């Protein structure tokens, strides 16, 4: 079931964000200091608790929170599914729910994250000519629109 995220979900949300980012981005950014010293569950949970992000976040919860989508206006700001539950339709359910219930029209994807780009293309998004540097790195984000 897809529902609005609550404070009770914070630790699970942070856990998903930290571990999926480590698994997906470590080979792209090659920054172990960031991945294992800065990117930690407790600080991520605190950051989300101290902001209004939860007001814009949905989770996929079937008794276990397995994925999340963060929507800011027309943008899909984040979409992550726990590594243990990927390729089971959870990300697809989240993005299709967002497309149906929110005016989402664009997102940014890491240019070298070809798996996510293919996923978004399968859900009606296409690459544009717009790109920007990921802050503090030499890697680019590419804009995708639907």
PLM features: what roles do these ranges have?
Residues 85, 89-97:
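Conserved acetyl-CoA pyrophosphate-binding loop and the N-cap/start of the following alpha-helix
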Residues 95, 100-112:
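Conserved GNAT acetyl-CoA-binding A-motif
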Residues 54-67:
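Conserved beta-hairpin
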Residues 1-15:
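A short beta-loop-alpha structural element at the N-terminal edge
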Residues 18-46:
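Conserved GNAT-fold acetyl-CoA-binding loop/helix
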Residues 75-86, 109-110:
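A short, internal acetyl-CoA/4′-phosphopantetheine-binding micro-motif in the GNAT/acyltransferase core
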Residues 120, 125:
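Conserved active-site tyrosine of GNAT-family acetyltransferases
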Residues 107-118, 133-138:
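Conserved beta-strand-loop-alpha-helix junction that forms the acyl-donor binding cleft
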């Amino acid at each position: 079931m897809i529902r609005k995220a609550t404070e009770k979900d914070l630790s699970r949300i942070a856990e998903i964000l930290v571990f999926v980012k480590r698994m997906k981005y470590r080979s792209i950014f090659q920054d172990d200091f960031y991945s294992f010293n800065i990117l930690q569950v407790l600080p991520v949970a605190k950051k989300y608790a101290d902001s209004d992000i939860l007001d814009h976040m949905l989770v996929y919860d079937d008794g276990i929170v397995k994925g999340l989508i963060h929507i800011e206006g027309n943008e899909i700001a984040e979409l992550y599914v726990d590594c243990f539950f990927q390729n089971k339709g959870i990300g697809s359910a989240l993005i299709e729910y967002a497309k149906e219930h929110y005016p989402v029209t664009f997102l940014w994807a890491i240019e070298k994250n070809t798996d996510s780009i293919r996923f978004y293309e399968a859900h009606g998004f296409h690459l544009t000519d717009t790109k920007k540097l990921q802050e503090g790195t030499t890697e680019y984000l590419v804009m995708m629109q639907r």
